[in-house]
């Protein structure tokens, strides 16, 4: 799956079809032939503690906004033979807005969107788009930058850790953003990264977090799907920052903040456009940040001093006002300039990010 993801993103970048909020939409607005009926396809169980649960927590907020109950089906694997019947069961019952939650749904959703041109399809972390299909993902580097600020401020050693799944663009940008945020508060901060090779592997995540604590790291961030790194941080008497959703419920003493999905803020406006008949799917997909909904910081644990929170919230507002996290000059660990002075890293550069800042130490 990892190699397939890399192949997709490389192809999209080469074609110029990288998700971007600024890309031109399809000329004609999509119109449903009947009142909208919305359904979700969940990749995992609804209470997985991370990615899927973030969608399930957004669902009741969406229900309130659109005035209808939204059913879902859990644990739909990234296999066409499972995705297609799950979606078609809803379509045959009159559901005409299908929301998916997995990269591996991309090709099947494209096929379904062509087979059912009067049904609207949206898919999180997907790569395919069309006149009635829009993939979307969030600018998580923005929220991870803010978490990095808190980590840098709260660390006594200046040694931060980060448990990550795979060294691919959307993970690497969270790591580099975390380091940039930490440097904002502590110019000597470093981030040691251990890749687990899996999105959801509590055993490997625990081993990675334990190894970090053994090295004297006193704040652990993450881009994996379970709260295990936060649980280990609490067990070891150190701090952590979460990902996907507010993870303080699992480690109330340790988790300082989280980079959290706020999908209702993105999906409610999109669904209202679908209902109004003026939805124009972005041909390159949607890429919302804090300003547009999709991602934000869940802040903060009461142990974080007010002056730190105030600085973080000021940076959050600066991001909303247009500040770009990856503003040059920036160099990678080899000393190569990756973002020139006076320039910002564009979306294509974000998706293909394969470099780390000098303060990032990647371990196997």
Residues covered by each model-derived region:
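Bacterial N-terminal signal peptides that target proteins for export
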Residues: 3-13
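A residue-level marker of the well-folded mature domains of exported/periplasmic proteins
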Residues: 5, 26-364
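Bacterial N-terminal signal peptides
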Residues: 12-22
């Amino acid at each position: 799956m990892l190699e397939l993801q890399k192949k997709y993103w490389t192809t999209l970048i080469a074609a110029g079809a990288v998700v971007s909020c600024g890309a031109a939409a399809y000329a004609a607005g999509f119109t449903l032939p009947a009142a909208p009926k919305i359904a979700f396809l969940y990749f995992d169980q609804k209470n997985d503690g991370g990615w899927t649960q973030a969608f399930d927590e957004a669902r009741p907020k969406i229900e309130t906004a659109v005035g209808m109950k939204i059913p879902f089906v859990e644990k739909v694997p990234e296999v066409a033979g499972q995705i297609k019947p799950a979606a078609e069961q809803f379509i045959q019952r009159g559901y005409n807005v299908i929301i998916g939650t997995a990269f591996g749904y991309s090709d099947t959703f494209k096929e379904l969107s062509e087979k059912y041109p009067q049904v609207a399809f949206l898919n999180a972390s997907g790569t395919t788009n069309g006149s009635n299909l829009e993939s979307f993902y969030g600018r998580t580097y923005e929220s991870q930058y803010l978490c990095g600020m808190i980590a840098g401020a709260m660390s006594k050693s200046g040694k931060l850790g980060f448990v990550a799944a795979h060294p691919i663009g959307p993970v690497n940008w969270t790591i580099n953003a975390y380091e940039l945020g930490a440097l904002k508060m502590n110019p000597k901060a470093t981030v040691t990264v251990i890749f687990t090779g899996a999105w959801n592997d509590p055993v490997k995540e625990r081993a990675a977090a334990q190894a970090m604590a053994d090295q004297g790291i006193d704040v652990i961030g993450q881009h994996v799907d379970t709260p295990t790194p936060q649980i280990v941080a609490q067990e070891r008497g150190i701090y952590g920052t979460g990902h996907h959703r507010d993870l303080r419920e699992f480690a109330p003493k340790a988790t300082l903040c989280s980079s959290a999905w706020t999908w209702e803020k993105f999906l409610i406006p999109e669904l209202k456009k679908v209902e109004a008949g003026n939805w124009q799917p972005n041909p390159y997909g949607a890429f919302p940040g804090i300003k547009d909904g999709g991602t934000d910081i869940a802040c903060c644990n009461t142990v974080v001093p007010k002056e730190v929170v105030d600085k973080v919230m000021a940076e959050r507002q600066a991001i909303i006002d247009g500040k770009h996290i990856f503003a040059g000059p920036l160099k990678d660990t080899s000393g190569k300039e990756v973002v020139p002075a006076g320039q910002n890293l564009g979306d294509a550069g974000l998706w293909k990010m394969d470099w780390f800042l000098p303060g990032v130490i990647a371990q196997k």
